[in-house]
Amino acid sequence: MHWLRTVAALREQVADWRGSTVGLVPTMGSLHEGHLSLIRRCRQECDHTVVSIFVNPLQFGPNEDWDRYPRDEEGDRALCEAAGVDVVFAPDPQEMGADPATGSDRTWVMPPESLLQTLCAPHRPGHFRGVATIVLQLLNLVQPQRAYFGQKDAQQLAIIQRLVRDLQIPTTIVPCSTVREADGLACSSRNRYLSAAERQVAAGLYRALRRGYDHWQAGDPSAEGILAAARAELEHTPELQLQYLELVDPQTLQPLPRVEDKGLLAIAAYVGQTRLIDNLLLSPEQGDPLPERVQHAAPPSSGTTSPPRRPLIAIDGPAGAGKSTVARAVAAQLQLLYLDTGAMYRAITWLALQRGIPLDDAEQLTQLAAQTQLTLQSGTSSTEPTRIWADGEEITQAIRSPEVTRWVSHVAAVPGVRQELVKRQRSIGRDGGAVLEGRDIGTHVFPDAELKVFLTASVGERAQRRQHQLQAQGQMVPLEELKAQIEQRDRRDSERLISPLRPAPDAILIDTDHLSQSEVQDKIVMLYRQLLERSGPARLDQ
């Protein structure tokens, strides 16, 4: 992946892609699942993916949050690399001619006045002028065939679509569905501002929209009825400071007296000091705006051929059976994504220990798992462990300490923690083409994984392996002590009520006691290739 900061470097890179399909995903960084869904869609439909990361000062007002807008370059870099992005363009304001110190002395792109009469525009004067200026600048620099925007920013989407059409820019603007948390809250970088209590209040935006949507679904297309239903729901959340609640045409953004064909029900409100926006499209073709679980980006439009889905490999087994080492090596050989689920549980355990959270306080542990942003990046080689960041701080080495090892199975047994992390694991692995290892991947996280492997080894063998790992880190722990710890952890893992350690009924058992790491790796690779021969999915290019 190339991380570029200058226009010259970007132009040089893009010039090498002549004749290929290039996709652009414009962002302001602090990436979350919403951005990742755009990136996944782009990678499915284009030969090359460019992600721009630019906190655009031109779209912030004098009293807005440009200075404190969340920035996480290290985490963004890791996420983009893991997602398979080809180029990240991350210029500074001076490079884009958007230095706040120069004021208004530059060329601006002015959106049509008719698109600035409703929704956010009256409350944020100049905002969409700044958005349009930088987006068109990016389109000119990258010259993509396709550019991907989220439906959550519906007014921005409508303005960009109109400008591209009016100026005859040869780029297809691809709208992508809003990605939501389980309670309906739309993913947003500004969600990071919210406290735990504010996070619960914020879910009221979606509930209000959903109430209006359900009213429309029940047969009343009038704006009066739809808006009244949404306002009635807002009365249950008085902490929300409503800025606007409007029903408009999705393309013209003009107010609608009733929904004849399509409508956009949009809301903006303050939760404490944080301004949040959201919307739902009222359209017979749209379908339910939120199924029971998190809704990810819409599938590619008709006529687009997506790459065939590659199988998932689920590797389970007890601590010390060699899962992580083997999984990394298999993923590297087969050119698959490697997801170290154990590192996620270790990260929450380490954070709990650092913050003094009692490990028997399930509520606090669950809240910690829900609020912590975890970023994982595969090592540069099959022998390098997964790098992991928690809220922007790298903790790769810290989570491998004996203290974390001692308590991680205790934290992993907390139902709320497992629920939060499993949700993230499923999000990452849902498109296939990944190797996941843990203790319940094949039985709980991905019970439909195409290839399930359960690695075993004796307690003595696993203790020796762990001792060698610790010695390499300069730590000396007696072998008998390690055996006792492993036996205790085996009992906890196998006896816990939630997702106990056990092989899936269709898992292939491999005893690693007398096998080298490369021999175990070869067995799994052979099983994978046999699976491909039987099912005929995507060809492997290795």
UniProtKB/Swiss-Prot annotation:
Give the family per the record.
In the N-terminal section; belongs to the pantothenate synthetase family.
Identify the residues that bind beta-alanine.
Answer: 59
Q: Name one GO biological process term.
A: pantothenate biosynthetic process
Q: Where in or outside the cell?
A: Cytoplasm
**Residues annotated for ATP binding in this entry:** 28-35, 150-153, 179, 187-190
This chain belongs to the protein called: Bifunctional pantoate ligase/cytidylate kinase
For this protein, the Enzyme Commission number is 6.3.2.1, 2.7.4.25
Which organism is this protein's natural source?
Answer: Synechococcus sp. (strain JA-2-3B'a(2-13)) (Cyanobacteria bacterium Yellowstone B-Prime)
A GO CC annotation given for this chain: cytosol
Quote the record's binding site residues for (R)-pantoate. Answer: 59, 156
Q: In which pathway does it act?
A: Cofactor biosynthesis; (R)-pantothenate biosynthesis; (R)-pantothenate from (R)-pantoate and beta-alanine: step 1/1
